[in-house]
Regions:
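Basic, amphipathic N-terminal segments that precede the first structured/catalytic domain
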Residues: 1-107, 299-302, 306-310, 315-321
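Core catalytic region of metal-dependent phosphoesterases/phosphodiesterases
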Residues: 50-70, 82-201
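Beta-strand-turn-beta hairpins that frame and shape the catalytic cleft
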Residues: 55-64, 223-232, 272-275
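Short helix/loop capping segments that flank catalytic or ligand/cofactor-binding pockets
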Residues: 74-76, 125, 242, 287-288
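Short, solvent-exposed loop/turn segments at secondary-structure boundaries
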Residues: 78, 181-185, 290-292
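Short, surface-exposed basic-aromatic patches at helix termini and helix-loop junctions that form
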Residues: 155-163, 225, 249-252, 269-272
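Domain-scale recognition of functional cores that engage charged ligands
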Residues: 165-168, 209, 218
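Conserved beta-sheet core of the metallophosphoesterase superfamily
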Residues: 188-192, 200-206, 213-218, 230-321
Length: 321
């Protein structure tokens, strides 16, 4: 075989290797050149910027104030978190109310709904070991202090609400009057006592300007509607597992939002379609119970929910205490 043939084949092989290495870069160069030419031809925006934009004359959003798990009467000491007692609770609630009032005024909110989502009190005899050891007050004192604190919160929010103010509450597992859950009487709950007191005050014209949701026939659940959204409120102590819980409450209507408490930390879960399950925080936060079970060191919090008619969007604001 002649040297010419060998040299020619070698050159061809080298050229093939060079082309093989350069080919991907050539495609990239062609792509970038084409993109530059395409961008030069864009004269108008792709999006129709005027579509769907309307200027509202006034704010039609409504506010839902979410309160839960105050556990009035419970106390513990902790050098890192500051512990918890009734005085600390009052400071945290006042901080939350101040934030709520500010949001109402700045956003020009007219209509407000307040839900208390259970466990107003701590109780004194829910455990075989003496629960009263960790409490500041008797059961009756816990109930009266809880009622007065709720009235104070409602009145402060009422003072800055120009439209409708609605209040509703449900009972939690700590609110049952019987300590042993296996011996409880259905509806025999602190929430009934508080609701009945507030309604009686209204009848005596001592607590006016507030619409109270009267669910005394079943204090464990509220079914309500805000901004054309069906809302169900339940403490959540009977809801187990990380599954969709809204279908469990559907009977003759579908609910858009499920609001629960009980677990003492904020959690938001999207269920089917645009349905939301919102778990409200607690004013306690991390405590000795959390420490024993190696649970998360959650900060105390309560939530504000902003809803808008004719929109599936929700805005949830967490106020850390």
């Amino acid at each position: 075989m002649s040297n010419y043939v060998v040299d020619n084949k070698r050159r061809l092989a080298e050229l093939r290797e060079v082309r093989k290495q350069q080919e991907p870069h050539a495609y990239t160069t062609i792509l970038m050149q084409d993109l530059r030419e395409d961008f030069k031809s864009i004269e108008e925006p792709i999006l129709d910027r005027e579509s769907g934009i309307t200027v509202k004359e006034s704010n039609d959003k409504e506010l839902v104030v979410l309160l839960s798990d105050w556990h009035i009467g419970y106390q513990f000491k902790d050098s890192k978190t500051g512990g918890y007692n009734f005085e600390i609770l009052k400071e945290r609630i006042q901080h939350f109310v101040n934030k709520t009032v500010k949001e109402i005024l700045e956003r020009d909110i007219r209509n407000v709904t307040i839900y208390f989502v259970g466990d107003l009190i701590e109780h004194v005899s829910m455990r075989n070991v003496n629960q009263a050891f960790d409490t500041e007050f008797t059961l009756s004192e816990q109930i009266t202090k809880g009622t007065r604190l709720l009235i104070d919160v409602i009145q402060q929010i009422s003072d800055v609400t120009d439209g409708n103010l609605t209040f509703g509450m449900i009972g939690g597992n700590h609110d049952r009057l019987q300590g042993n859950k296996n011996e409880k009487i259905y509806n025999d709950n602190v929430a009934y006592i508080v609701l009945d007191t507030l309604i009686n005050l209204q009848e005596l014209e001592l607590f006016n300007g507030i619409e109270i949701i009267d669910n005394r026939d079943d204090v464990y659940t509220i079914e309500d509607q805000v901004c054309v959204k069906n809302i169900i409120v339940n403490h959540g102590d009977t809801l187990k597992g990380n599954v969709n819980h809204i279908p469990k409450f559907i009977k003759d209507q579908v609910f858009d939002i499920l609001i629960t408490g009980h677990v003492h930390h904020l959690k938001v879960k999207q269920e089917d379609y645009t349905r939301q399950h919102i778990t409200v925080g607690s004013t306690i936060g991390y405590n000795t119970y959390s420490k024993e079970l190696n649970l998360s060191r959650t900060a105390p919090s309560q939530q504000l929910l902003f809803l808008e008619p004719n929109s599936d969007d929700i805005e949830l604001k967490t106020v850390y205490l």
